[in-house]
Amino acid sequence: MSKGQVLRNDQGIETTVRDSEGQRGDITGFGLCLQTEGMSGDETVFERIRGACRVAGRADNPQGLHQILSEWGLGHRAEDRICKLSGGLRRRVAVLSALVPVALNSEPSVVLLDEPSEGLDQSSRGLLLGWLRALAERGHGILVATHDPEVITACDRIVTISENSELTSKVQQSKLDIANLPEPCSAESHMELVAWACRLERRNPIDTIGRGVPALVALLLAYTLSTDITRSSENYDLLAALTLTPVFITAIVTPAIIKRLSEERAGDWWRAMSGAGSRGWFSIMGVSLILPIPMVYLSWYVIAGDISSTMNSDVMLWLWLFAFVIIDLSVAASALHLMVSDLTRSGAVAGILLQLVLIWPFLQMTSALTSIMSNGMSFELALGEPFADIAIAWLTVVLLWAMAVIIPED
């Protein structure tokens, strides 16, 4: 919340607190440690800490980060993937992801920690307490949810919630030693969310494989069906549909980013750190920007058969337009998948059926390709003309994306 008021109510009445303008505000630059790790297993230890600093707006300082990792007993595992770490080491990485960005911030900031000591050994607990005290001395605010008596001793104020939901508060003066923190560094803007998604896909291309394999299977089936179809004008609509079906399938497959965001609540961490509009970025990062282009040309090459060279040249000249719309359709499909995944019952049939709306732009593109095959490309804006059909398909896709991204509340 960036505007409005937060009021305490002890009368047992539930009150909805929200932005006075009805929108979620951008609150960035803070530290966050969830009770679950909030990390993807395909990240390396160093990438995670550096990424947390980048998304908080801190400049790169590889040497300083490696020194911090060494102090926390993670120096020798800096290039290891998080999935290969033990539970205790993963917890250290999650805690550092919250503490380091704030420690490098010269301006007062906030750290939110949920059971940070859970799974830490005694040495790491000591480091945690020392860092908490040092951050507090620098003027940073720290909010900790914990049942650990050791962590409670590091706090200046203790708020206890009883079984009957009554709040009690007391102030104490902690006498724990203060750790030596790294020096703050300058602010710097990064597109870390995009870099994170691209980095994980390069390392483990499950999205490309997950889209490519069904598309190739569909292409083989389309080719089998097309062998008995006469290449004449009365069959152009069927040939157009068979040509576009494989590339359409690449667009509507569930993107791998859904799985990556659901892993250990990584999506919750990124949503909190990225601020408003994160779903829009997720939908863009959840698409394959390259696969539709070669797939649509390959599909036409396989399906075209003995079509005349003149028609073949006309179609080949404008197939990139269909690939462009398919890429946008893939963004809209990813947004719909993300919207459904956020529902309480994400696997419900009603949620899955939302994907059926994507058939409409597919039919518009099929109509456009049929017209190009019959009469060549036309830029008239009348209904039924190729360019008009492609434009309608694109506008439909944009509206579907806006519906999935803008309308639902974060």
Tell me the role of every PLM-derived stretch.
Residues 12-31:
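ABC ATPase NBD coupling module
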Residues 36, 41-57:
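Q-loop/switch helix immediately C-terminal to the Walker
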Residues 95, 99:
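Hydrophobic anchor residue at the start of the ABC signature
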Residues 145-147:
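H-loop/switch region of ABC-family ATPase nucleotide-binding domains
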Residues 222, 226, 237-258:
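Long, hydrophobic alpha-helical segments
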